[in-house]
Swiss-Prot record:
Cross-referenced SUPFAM superfamilies: Histone H3 K4-specific methyltransferase SET7/9 N-terminal domain
Subcellular location per the Swiss-Prot or TrEMBL entry: Cell projection, Cilium, Flagellum
Entry keyword set: Cell projection, Cilium, Flagellum, Repeat
This protein's record includes keyword Repeat: yes
Any Gene Ontology CC annotation: sperm flagellum
Pfam families hit by this protein: MORN
Tissue: Expressed in sperm (at protein level).
PANTHER family per the UniProt record, alphabetical: MORN REPEAT-CONTAINING PROTEIN 5
Protein name per its UniProtKB record: MORN repeat-containing protein 5
Gene3D superfamilies according to UniProt: Histone H3 K4-specific methyltransferase SET7/9 N-terminal domain
Organism taxonomic ancestry: Eukaryota, Metazoa, Chordata, Craniata, Vertebrata
MORN repeat extents: 8-30, 31-53, 54-75
Length: 161
């Protein structure tokens, strides 16, 4: 574990991570749930540093069924996703709290919006640097490297500083 920067607190069977566990990844994402042969297996939840979470049924390390909940309580629905689509452009906070008066536009779900560093994009869970193709959370901690599809989506869709 010390080699990867991860931490495991849980049961072992024959020297392998198995049973109920808490697994802390180097990104500070935390898995709480069942393990089998060193993999997520059974019911378990990933808790992300942003405050969002993914509850799933896992099979040999792969999520076979799950639900994602954003930090503001919005649930992602793969089949009937109508949040901020072509028909209803309201942010979740506007759905919960109503629209602002005319002339007081809301630019992001967070109001007032975060200040974006020059040349970066706000991609919802952090700031994206298009030169390094790295997304860091709002506390400047590494989240991920963006692939070509995510890079294209962010630069086409997200607010730029």
């Amino acid at each position: 574990m010390e080699y990867t920067g991860s931490k495991y607190i849980g049961e072992y069977v024959d020297g392998r991570m198995e049973g109920k566990a808490k697994y802390i990844l180097p990104t500070e994402t935390i898995y709480v749930g069942e393990m089998k042969d060193g993999m997520f297996h059974g019911e378990g939840t990933l808790y992300f540093p942003s405050g969002s979470q993914y509850d799933a049924i896992w099979e040999n390390g792969l999520a076979i069924k799950g639900t994602y909940t954003f930090s503001d309580g919005l649930h992602y629905d793969e089949k009937n996703w109508h949040y901020c689509d072509g028909y209803d452009r309201r942010f979740y906070t506007e759905i919960l709290n109503g629209l602002k008066p005319a002339g007081m536009a809301q630019l992001t779900n967070m109001d007032p919006p975060r200040k974006i560093p020059k040349g970066y994009y706000d991609c919802g869970d952090g700031f994206y640097n298009p030169v390094t193709r790295v997304v860091k959370d709002y506390r400047n901690r590494f989240l991920r490297n963006a692939d070509d599809d995510e890079h294209e989506w962010i630069t086409r869709t997200c607010r730029k500083g």
